[in-house]
């Protein structure tokens, strides 16, 4: 088996191959200085296109780096030598493959044929030349396409002496005779000015100068973009502004009209859908009415009560499927609303959670509360004559700060009415916390407290002792004393009286302010 090429041979070979002008650009995208190669096609690629080829798979394209990889074998080098970007471009163009997409291009019939051709040429070159670095076509063709011969500078070619170019021209044979004749003619013209340097008009000298620089000047001495019309600044007239404004107004009107049309169409579609839905509801309601007519009386009543029917029901306020009716609000007959006794708990704001409820006339709260507590027949409780604490405006607290818990009410009311507690327990030798805060519910304590209250009386009766003074309440009557414990009733009564006093103070202050402000009128 032949020895593998070393790193020096690989670098020398690729330096010669990359010197070919067509191999200086990527075969797919045309990027300069490609450093990767596809052995399958013998072409040079950039790093981006090499990634695309790598994604195609090794069965379509085998990628190697011309600078980093050093494990090339002779067959791979022969494939690169017999290939090249120029040969691949000509083959693909000849077979009508002009696609830019890599997947389409390298899966085509032309790519398959070119892969087979490169493999056959590489195998033939390997069998013929073995481990020789160069092959015949490269030794004869590559120097002719070297950049030193083809990409020569124009000024260097005409300013340097032609001695270096004459020997190669003389060795080319009959095919280079016209070029040799041109070189000899140019040499004779260049020597003419030196022989006639004293002539009054050295025309050959000036002609030679004009052929070197004069022909290049017109291409280099191009003016700027000022000569081209339509690219510079133009004067704007008032007519152009008016035209632009008119176009903007027309566009704005068109947009408004389109928006109005769209809105109208949306409304029409919505009305049509609502009308259709209402018709469907009516049809369903009629069907349900027919079903309910077949039921018996009791079953029909149960169906209506449970919401199983769609007919109008007296016990149900409203149904979605029933006919729509306009509900008008009626004006209340009297300013004072009739409420039950339990609504009084919500008015005070002490035992109810949430916002307090008020009557229509806030100034009548004090009177109504006072009248309720003063009439013993209304509540069926004993009225105890106690000294009311002094109520001021500063002692009124906001509704949001009022307590919503019974224990908080007891603590706060006992703290605010400390003077009343002193008067109440002034003659007692010892008291407990339950007695002080009103939490004692024992019957013995109730009896003792009543005895202390009636200690100064000359005579007492059973109705005074047990809280049934008038005996107006029969066995079947319901009073607040039957609902709440006695201690809670007393505490609640005291709280209501306090609130009534505060409201009275507020009403008095409002009336005084009104009299002070409007009294002079």
UniProtKB/Swiss-Prot annotation:
Transmembrane segments: none annotated. InterPro entries: ARFGAP/RecO, ArfGAP_dom, ArfGAP_dom_sf. The modification N-acetylalanine is found at residue 2. Gene3D superfamilies: Arf GTPase activating protein. It is a peripheral membrane protein. Pfam families: ArfGap. One of its GO terms (cellular component) is Golgi membrane. SUPFAM superfamilies: ArfGap/RecO-like zinc finger (SSF57863). One of its GO terms (biological process) is protein transport. Interacts with the coatomer complex. Interacts with the C-terminal appendage domain of COPG1. This is ADP-ribosylation factor GTPase-activating protein 2. It comes from Pongo abelii. The lineage of its organism: Eukaryota, Metazoa, Chordata, Craniata, Vertebrata. The gene is ARFGAP2.
């Amino acid at each position: 088996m032949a020895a593998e090429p070393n790193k020096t041979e690989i670098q020398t070979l690729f330096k010669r191959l990359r010197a070919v002008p067509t191999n200086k650009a990527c075969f797919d995208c045309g990027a300069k200085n490609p450093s990767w190669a596809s052995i399958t096609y013998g072409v040079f690629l950039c790093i981006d296109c090499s990634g695309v080829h790598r994604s195609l798979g090794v069965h379509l394209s085998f990628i190697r780096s011309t600078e980093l990889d050093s494990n090339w074998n002779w067959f791979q080098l022969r494939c690169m030598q017999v290939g090249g970007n120029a040969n691949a471009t000509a083959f693909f163009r000849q077979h009508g493959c002009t696609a830019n997409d890599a997947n389409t291009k390298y899966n085509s019939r032309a790519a398959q044929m070119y892969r087979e051709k490169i493999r056959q040429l590489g195998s033939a070159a390997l069998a013929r030349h073995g481990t020789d670095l160069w092959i015949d076509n490269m030794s004869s063709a590559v120097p002719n396409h070297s950049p030193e011969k083809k990409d020569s500078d124009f000024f260097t070619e005409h300013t340097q002496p032609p001695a270096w170019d004459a020997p190669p021209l003389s060795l080319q044979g009959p095919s280079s005779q016209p070029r040799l004749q041109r070189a000899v003619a140019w040499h004779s013209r260049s020597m003419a000015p030196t022989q006639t340097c004293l002539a009054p008009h050295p025309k050959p000298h000036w002609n030679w100068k004009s052929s070197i620089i004069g022909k290049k000047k017109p291409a280099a001495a191009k003016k700027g973009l000022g000569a081209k019309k339509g690219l510079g600044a133009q004067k704007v007239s008032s007519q152009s502004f008016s035209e632009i404004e008119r176009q903007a107004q027309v566009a704005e009107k068109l947009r408004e009209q389109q928006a109005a049309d769209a809105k109208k169409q949306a409304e029409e579609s919505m009305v049509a859908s609502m009308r259709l839905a209402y018709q469907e509801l009516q049809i369903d309601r009629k069907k349900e009415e027919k079903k309910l007519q077949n039921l018996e009386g009791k079953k029909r009543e149960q169906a209506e009560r449970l919401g199983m029917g769609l007919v109008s029901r007296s016990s149900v306020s409203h149904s979605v499927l029933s006919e729509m009716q306009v509900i008008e609000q009626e004006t209340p007959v009297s300013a004072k609303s009739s409420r039950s006794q339990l609504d009084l708990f919500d008015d005070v704001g002490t035992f109810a959670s949430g916002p307090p409820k008020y009557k229509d006339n806030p100034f009548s709260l004090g009177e109504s509360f006072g009248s309720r507590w003063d009439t013993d027949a209304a509540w069926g409780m004993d009225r105890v004559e106690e000294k009311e604490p002094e109520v001021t405006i500063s002692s009124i607290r906001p509704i949001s700060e009022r307590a919503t818990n019974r224990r908080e009410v007891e603590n706060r009311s006992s703290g605010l009415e400390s003077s009343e507690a002193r008067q109440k327990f002034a003659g007692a030798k010892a008291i407990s916390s339950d007695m002080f805060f009103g939490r004692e519910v024992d019957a013995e304590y109730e009896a003792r407290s009543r005895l202390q209250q009636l200690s100064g009386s000359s005579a007492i009766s059973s109705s005074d002792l047990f809280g049934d003074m008038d005996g107006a309440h029969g066995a079947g009557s319901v009073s607040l004393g039957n609902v709440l414990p006695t201690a809670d009733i007393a505490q609640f009564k005291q709280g209501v009286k306090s609130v009534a006093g505060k409201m009275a103070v507020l009403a008095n202050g409002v009336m005084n302010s009104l009299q002070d402000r409007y009294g002079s009128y």
